[in-house]
Amino acid sequence: MADSSNKAMPLRIALLAQAADAAGLSADILASLPAVQHIAVNDDFNAALHTAIQAVNQGQLVQLTLQCKPNEPQQRLLMLSGLAAAKNKIHPHAYLAGFAEGSVNSIEIALTQSRRQKADLSHQQTSETLAADQQFLAFFNMVDNIARRTLNAAGNKNHYWFTEPHKARVASLTLNANTDSESSLVLTQATGLQKAQSLLNASRLFFVLSGLNETALSVQLEQLKQRLADLPNDLAPNDLTPNDKAALIALMAKNLTQFQTDVSSSATSSISLPTIVLQGASITAVLQEISAISNALPKVIAEKSHYKTPAGSCFSPAPNSKGGVTFVYPGVGTVYPGMFREFHQYFPALFAQLEREGNLKEMLQAEKTYGENPAEMTLGELAIAGVGSSYLLTQLLCEEFAVKPDFALGYSKGEASMWASLGVWKNPHALIELTQTSPIFTTAISGKLTAVREAWQLTDAEEITWNSFVVRCDSASIEALLPEFPRAYLAIIQGDTCVLAGCEATCRALLKKLGKRGIAANRVTAMHTTPALSQHSQVTEFYTQPLCDQLPTNIKFISAAGLLPQNQNVPVSIDSQSIANSIADTFCTTLDFTALIRTAREQGARLFVEIGADRQTSTLIDKINRTDNVTTESCTVAANAKGGEDIVTLLKCIAQLITHQIPLSLSPLLQGLEEQVNTLKLRSASSANTIPNTTQGEPV
């Protein structure tokens, strides 16, 4: 049995968690390693693990598995010394650093062996009684979760495994807790990442068709219909055989590859190719989408309208969006519990990069965003998470999909997100701690509302009951009444609604006289009101930030501050002081978002892409466009939506960018498809004679 004393030698055993149908280690690596020793877990997990550890310590390469029938696919753990892994440039998924058994103090003994403290643990898992096979699976899953940077939360709501900056993930697994056979393992993070999950699969289908005219598009639709009809289209995706799944995935891959070729050809010849995107959760669903768009095609082309379905299929026959892609950054308060919960599994390298750049945990306010009982956020916390969510989505679209915006603007504090996300500010992460402690956000325009107290000349003993209300009304009607209600302010003008803020009783009295009903936001913030003007110099100082050495030259930044009389529609100069002044001007005065969108359209903005949590700003822009009767010329796209699946919403966003003929990369879609084709072929062949490994590495 394992040495359970405090003098146990420290372990550094490299672990690789291998799914049943994973690809194999290369022949070159296998040739430089010892022959594989197969160890199966029968009815005693501890004994099998102890044997495996001894074998590794003797220089062996071990494959730990469950006892299964011959050739039956199974999950496997590959174990070898950390030194051997390093010499062969293998990126382990985790390290086994401590193992103790036969003591109710096993966790303390295992931690001592691993040279770790209990405070180092970022995750602890304890199981009372488990059978040997369940113990193996618990071990396997923890290694896999470390490699996926995934924490299993309550209600099967997994999320990213956040850590403090430059601190590795350390986890403990205690089995048969509080018994004489209790055992504990301590696992630490290594450099290996499991490969990204595929954005597309048999239940997330995505096809792109392009053609010069209606006839060409109709032919393409009919051809795809025939190819899909040749597959078993009456089965649910999970009921398809590996061969049928492989054929379906290969069809998607071939389609997207062909589209890329067509786009490249049309780009060199300057010919615009109208493009249809079809999406569906099954073959049957896509066939229904084909039928629907085939029927609608003549009318859509004749009217040059935009076609969209709930499944995400879309078609814009004559888009006018090229050169007019506008990133729109939402304001404070759009973040929601569990946002972006799935993204890290599909973009692991991006999350690893963001983690290296700064404090990702603080950037997304993870403890409140992903906690089991998400807590109410302060204004400062909402501001941080809002900028963080926009920063993440910007990197995802720009780095992964190579989307390049032509314009950028922000709703309210979204202007700060804009400068932070698009390569203008050198160190946007520095603002996280400043926002948490700055009196601007903690007391002046939120919390105690000291700026309001000063403006209203109140004593510390006098109470302020502040609120804001969304009211469906034109701004002129509200402005006409403001002199009668000096403690109520028109904060925001946004399409067919306005935001009224101030003393709750005063606002309610104004609404009563107006004959309108307001929806209370129940959020304490004096942004965009007269009292905020006293904070102008402080806000300017706060946002005076050093700029990147190389600044974006192809993006036109539009600020609401440009609408103010003193700025006379002059574009913001890209220097620290001008940017800070523009944010302060926007922050401290009424925001006319309607005028901002109209100004953007006048400058050439056409396709408004919301870059942040939820789609609240998209809804506002849609209303403004409808009021102005420009829905054919101007469209909105949301990259995220509360209540929807992160990846499904993202794919709908990508689909609309494609049909609007916006240049982008399809590599994130194709990579996952190619991986699946290879995996399904391997599963179908059932000839797993090599040791599987998927070792996407990240820099140490």
Go through the PLM ranges and name each one:
Residues 211, 280, 305-477, 526, ...:
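FabD-like malonyl-/acyl-CoA
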Residues 267-269, 410, 488-494, 498, ...:
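Short beta-strand
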Residues 227-231, 296-301, 487-489, 511-523:
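A common structural junction motif
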Residues 271, 451-462, 518-608:
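Acyltransferase
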